Amino acid sequence: MTTRVTLISPAMNPAVREARFDDGCSLDAAGAARARSAADEVRPAAAALVSPAVRCRQTAAALGLHVRDEPALAGLDMGRWRGLTLDEAAAREPEALARWLADPAARPHGGESVHLLCARVGGWLDEAARTSGRLVAVVEPEVVRAATVRVLGAPEDAFWRIDVAPLTATAFTGRAGRWNLAPGTALGRTDRTPAERPGR
């Protein structure tokens, strides 16, 4: 029994362009257009899921996916740092930010810790591995990071060393309790053959 999970990061929005923690803003025009152009690159799946975030919902709609909410795949709750840049958080609470970046269990912003996020996403992956077929989900970049940490059996501080670009598809294939990872593939390009498209 093989399970294939494809996690798609959302397209560009102002928070990404300005390097801010997401604050619920919509996709910008370029991000929405790129997502629409990628609609035929996403293969049909037995189930299509989405993070509750606005930019994830809008990306899923632009891709033509008929999705249902999956709370277990929600993004990291940044508490009172929501909408701030890293520099702004550092200026307001330098010691708290340093602690957060150094300790996956820390949550000085009053939201969710990286440790809790990794546990939540890892639990969802464990459940997904009990089913066969193809799943696709549009999720926040930090969810892709957390899934990668779990699949590779990496320490949680490796979370910070994983980059996830906007509108990329990362595939995880699970069988007999073991996952394999196919690194993120950019969507919305026109210079790939059908065989190179994500999920092939």
Model regions: which residues?
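GST superfamily/GST-like fold recognition
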Residues: 141-145, 174
